[in-house]
UniProtKB/Swiss-Prot annotation:
It comes from Arabidopsis thaliana (Mouse-ear cress). PROSITE patterns: IQ (PS50096). This is Protein IQ-DOMAIN 1. Residues 272-454 are annotated as: Disordered. It holds the Pfam family IQ. Residues 107-136 form the IQ domain. Expressed in roots, flowers, stems, siliques, inflorescence stems and whole shoots. Restricted to the vascular bundles. Keywords: Calmodulin-binding, Cytoplasm, Cytoskeleton, Nucleus.
Length: 454
């Protein structure tokens, strides 16, 4: 700070005039120029001794075209002072000093003096300016000024560099924001166009984020469900041993759960379709159950009605017909040999093994109908034998033989027809139903009472 203050003082001194010197200098005589206060001093007392002959001075000046020199002026002044008698100091101050402007008027002398003083002032000022320029030149060529100039230039360069970087960054950010805004607008327009064209417009009051969160939650739930099902299925498969089928399905032998996992994944990926299909399947199952129950009821009713008709026909008092049937077949039927029976049983076992399926299923409605019809036939064949046995004890042996032959024939015929009916029932029945026990009605007591009454 001290050096800076000194430097500023030096600069100010270089450009400021010397006012102090002008104040202290009262009278200066440079280049034979008399100052203004000396010329203004005039004597109030005009004495004839000190009168100056103006005509003579003018005449001399006219002769000499150039103005008188300083030596002549000083000589004249000294001559006048020598010639004058001694007097008081007041009279000395009032003495008129003869100068070179003696032959001119006062106005002309004043104008000349003013011009000379003004020219001297201009010359002094020019010299001061020249001195100040030299001092300034010396200061500018110094090391301090050079150091300060280098520092200022570096600061200006850094400021300009920072400003240029800030401007370029602002321009780049504005361009990036514009490009991003355009991309968002294009994406939004594409989404709207796709939704309008697809017709999958969502009219819910939820926001896009909420809808996406719900879809993600559903997807995670389906994936969890699929994993749980796969885990349970693998454990069930490890616990159970499935029998190999004759015609295996098309699947990967290394991965036994190939078809199941693919189907489950496909169904889990479409929850709305799976819900609709489940509803349809439940409706179909309900309708099939209703149809099966109706068929069961109809089959049971028909079986019951047929059994009742047969029982009524058998309970009627037709003793001569029974006796005639017993007398018509007096011949004894030959019993079937054991070899034929064994062959028929082997054939039946082979046919049943061929037609047997690996799937475990319960007998359906047709099986119940076959069982009911077979029991009804057996009961109808047994009832007349009891009547004839009680009516005619002599023909007991023949009736027993007939009954045994008829039962063996029926037993040999029924197993051959049963597998075909079972195959039809398993293919026609939609789902396994519980077994319906169809036993023949107990009619022995009623028959005995009807026989006793007549």
């Amino acid at each position: 700070m001290v050096k800076k203050a000194k430097w500023l003082k030096n600069v100010k001194k270089a450009f400021s005039p010397d006012s102090k010197k002008l104040k202290h200098e009262s009278v200066e005589c440079q280049d034979s120029v008399i100052s203004y206060p000396v010329l203004i001093a005039t004597s109030r007392s005009s004495s004839p001794q000190f009168e100056v002959r103006v005509d003579e001075v003018n005449y001399e000046q006219k002769k000499n075209l150039y103005p008188p020199s300083s030596d002549s002026v000083t000589a004249t002044v000294a001559h006048v002072l020598v010639d004058s008698p001694p007097s008081s100091p007041e009279s000395v101050h009032q003495a008129i000093v003869v100068n070179r402007f003696a032959g001119k008027s006062k106005e002309e002398a004043a104008a000349i003096l003013i011009q000379s003083t003004f020219r001297g002032h201009l010359a002094r000022r020019e010299s001061q300016v020249m001195r100040g320029q030299e001092r300034l030149k010396l200061l500018m060529e110094g090391s301090v000024v050079q150091r300060q100039a280098a520092i200022t230039l570096k600061c200006m360069q850094t400021l300009s560099r920072v400003q240029s970087q800030i401007r370029s960054r602002r321009i780049r950010m504005s361009e990036e924001n514009q490009a991003r805004h355009k991309q968002l607008l294009q994406k939004h327009a594409k989404e709207l166009g796709g939704l309008k064209n697809g017709g999958n417009w969502n009219y819910s009051n939820q926001s896009k984020e909420q809808v996406e969160a719900g879809m993600l939650h559903k997807y995670e739930a389906t994936m969890r469900r699929e994993r749980a099902l796969a885990y349970a299925f693998t454990h069930q498969q490890n616990l159970k041993s499935f029998s190999k089928t004759a015609n295996p399905m098309f699947m990967d032998p290394s991965n036994p759960t190939w078809g199941w996992s693919w189907l489950e994944r496909w169904m889990a990926g479409r929850p709305w379709e799976s819900s609709e299909k489940e509803q349809n399947t439940t409706n179909n199952d309900n309708s099939s159950v209703k149809n099966s129950t109706n068929r069961n009821s109809q089959g049971g009713e028909t079986a019951k009605s047929s059994n009742r008709n047969k029982l009524n026909s058998s309970t009627k008092p037709n003793t001569p017909s029974a006796s005639s049937t017993a007398t018509r077949n007096p011949r004894k039927k030959r019993p079937i040999p054991s070899s034929i029976k064994s062959k028929s049983s082997d054939d039946e076992a082979k046919s049943s093994e061929r037609n047997r399926r690996p799937s475990i299923a319960r007998p359906s409605v047709s099986d119940d109908e076959t069982l009911s019809s077979s029991t009804a036939r057996r009961s109808s064949n047994l009832i007349p034998t009891t009547k004839s046995a009680r009516g005619k004890p002599k023909s007991q042996t023949s009736s027993r033989v007939a009954v045994t032959t008829s039962t063996t024939e029926e037993s040999s015929i029924l197993p051959e027809k049963a597998p075909a009916k079972k195959r039809l029932s398993t293919s026609a029945s939609p789902a396994p139903k519980p077994r319906r026990s169809s036993a023949p009605p107990k009619v022995e007591k009623g028959v005995l009472k009807a026989e006793r009454t007549p």
